[in-house]
């Protein structure tokens, strides 16, 4: 199995953006595909993409199969949130000013291929390193009652604070994390619980949607008893990568990247309005 230290010969390029406008909610997912394409062209690097949002609910593609999907989206909008469907695995998650969204884009061109579980464990290792000065153990297993449940839910004392998703294009892998840093996590859980209650509406579903229990989740500030800001957590990610032997630099959005982004954004716009 490959550990994150095995990759520290790669330069980490950091791209950070904050999404505050509803018409830019798809931008991080477009950038994700741009970065996957870039690592297929130039695999001698990794990319750390930091992309917090405000007042958004990121939906999975399977959420569109809800019997009453349209009215479920309206429950989100009625509470002042904007729904957006992502092109990566998983189900609905909240993305507000207390949630850190980040992606690690990794080349998969070594002799030993990086399996799906191995890729997730690279992110787990990064998060554990980022908070290694705290004594609390960070576990990874599915937390029943959480939203967007999965085998790589990150939790402390049985309460989930982060979840992972993954996307692959050829020889590049993107592992994303949403991490509840601060704010009212119980309110976030109730928002998603209400979304599924309205979306299912007592009807039969082919998909096993989660029965969300808000108290199954908490934010990192509560679990570690420290008032983290998003900026502090981002700095911890940077520091952890340096501790693991990586060199970091700010991503240069060169013309080829910008051209790829424009092409994919134009395509997404046409598909949305088709």
Regions from the PLM with identified roles:
Residues 158-166, 174:
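Aromatic/basic-lined ligand-recognition segments
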